[in-house]
Amino acid sequence: MEDLDHEYKNYWETTMFFQNQELEFDSWPMEEAFSGSGESSSPDGAATSPASSKNVVSERNRRQKLNQRLFALRSVVPNISKLDKASVIKDSIDYMQELIDQEKTLEAEIRELESRSTLLENPVRDYDCNFAETHLQDFSDNNDMRSKKFKQMDYSTRVQHYPIEVLEMKVTWMGEKTVVVCITCSKKRETMVQLCKVLESLNLNILTTNFSSFTSRLSTTLFLQVTLSLSPSLISLFGNVITSTNYKILNASREYCTCLVLV
């Protein structure tokens, strides 16, 4: 019975000791602050009180700065799981790692875009220099052969002649010296050029010329200045120069109008 009382007494004293130590550890800044504010009875108290109060103030300032930085960090990080210090720091580290990964991804995309733009500006050749020189030499040889072939060709085969297909030709006298010639022909390649050459070859005094182009026809109206002595041979002159096709001359009027229609 005495042993049990002794052990219970020791247990009680040990528990009280740890409780007292915890209270002293938690309340030492306040005790030092209060002890520094008053006068000390010991001769060393005057020297230790200002130092203790200075330490308390510096510790308070340090914790205040730390809390301010944590608040600023909490406002920057978008995802905060908890509001304690450890969670804020952990979430900040995770967010920084996420930003680093995004930076690497963007840099890779930028490099890929730059490489594509370089390929578009300067395309890469799949053959070496020797193959390129050989290819260029063959190309130049082929061009020389083609030019020789073109030189050997006859001029008549290169410049084709497109005859004028006259559909209707009408000659009308307007007075004694003025004649109106209306020519209607089918519209083909170089028809207008050939017709102009024909008119120039006649060596007639042309006052005015009017060309009208349609989908499949080309109409030309000429105002000529001629003499009456030329009137019998005017139609035959046009017929022989324009084309070698046989025409049938229809006299609508003996003195004023003569029509030439293609047979």
Curated annotation (Swiss-Prot):
The keyword Nucleotide-binding belongs to this UniProt entry's keyword annotation: no
Compositional bias (Low complexity): 32-47
Keyword Nucleus: yes
Organism: Arabidopsis thaliana
Alphabetic keyword roster: DNA-binding, Nucleus, Transcription, Transcription regulation
Positions with biased composition (Polar residues): 49-58
Protein known as: Transcription factor bHLH27
Region of interest called Disordered, as start-end residue ranges on this chain: 32-61
Pfam families referenced in this protein's UniProt entry, alphabetically: bHLH-TF_ACT-like_plant (PF22754), HLH (PF00010)
Entry's Gene Ontology molecular function annotations: DNA binding; DNA-binding transcription factor activity; protein dimerization activity
GO cellular component, one term: nucleus
TM stretches of this protein: none
SMART domains documented for this protein: HLH
